Structure formats: structure tokens, C-alpha cells
């Protein structure tokens, strides 16, 4: 077991990828990523793989299923801790077999030096989706 939110708490993290219908009916778990964090080193950093990789791997599982679900529209929703650029690049490399959405809570810096909100809202919106 490894540290959780606080170093004194011990346990494991679980990141499921699950499927639901447009009517919100659960279909089941497609993939599960489990890990225990390593302790922080003297500089306050943790070793091991970046935890944001779990979002990329979840998208890859959806992409693997795309051939068997050609008549189904697939959407992948990543949490705000997902690596936006890495997910965009991986989706593009796989041919975008599923729509994707990354929830974002912060105005992140982009590789070119721009900020996310300004970049994303620079052009006129091409559509809008409302979630009840």
C-alpha cells in the first residue's frame, strides 16, 4: 500500500473506465487502473509513472473496442487532472476512434505559451452541448 492524499493515509487508488448509455444506464466496467503511490523523496516528488497516464490508457481501451462497436458513438470523458495535450495527441495518433472531452478547472499553459481558455474560445463556437 502507498500514501493517499496525506502521507500518513495508506491505500491504493482505483481508476475505472466504465460505459453508460445516453439514458444513463450503466453497462459495466471496461477497464480498471490500480496503483499505489510511492513515498515522496527529499525534494517532495514521487517516483513512478505519471498518474495522468491513466486517462490515456482509458482512451486506448475505448479505441481498441472501436472496431467491434462501429455502429456505436463512443465518448471518453477525462477528469481535470488528465493531460489535455497528451490525450489530444494520442487520440489523433489513433485516428480519433472516439470523441473525447477533458474537464478543466484551471487556465492551463499550452506548449506555444498560450493559455487554454483564450485558445479554446478564440474561434466562434461550432456547437453547444447541455448536460441535464
Predicted region positions:
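Conserved, well-structured functional cores that handle cations and Mg-NTP chemistry
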Residues: 1-132
Amino acid at each position: 500500500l502507498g500514501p493517499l492524499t496525506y502521507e500518513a493515509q495508506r491505500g491504493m487508488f482505483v481508476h475505472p473506465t466504465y460505459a453508460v448509455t445516453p439514458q444513463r444506464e450503466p453497462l459495466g466496467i471496461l477497464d480498471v487502473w490500480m496503483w499505489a503511490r510511492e513515498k515522496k523523496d527529499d525534494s517532495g516528488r514521487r517516483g513512478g509513472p505519471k498518474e495522468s497516464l491513466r486517462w490515456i490508457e482509458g482512451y486506448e481501451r475505448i479505441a481498441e473496442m472501436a472496431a467491434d462497436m462501429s455502429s456505436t458513438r463512443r465518448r471518453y470523458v477525462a477528469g481535470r487532472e488528465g493531460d489535455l495535450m497528451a490525450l489530444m495527441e494520442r487520440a489523433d495518433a489513433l485516428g480519433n476512434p472516439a470523441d473525447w472531452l477533458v474537464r478543466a478547472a484551471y487556465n492551463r499553459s499550452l506548449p506555444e505559451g498560450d493559455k487554454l481558455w483564450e485558445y479554446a474560445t478564440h474561434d466562434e463556437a461550432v456547437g453547444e452541448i447541455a448536460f441535464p
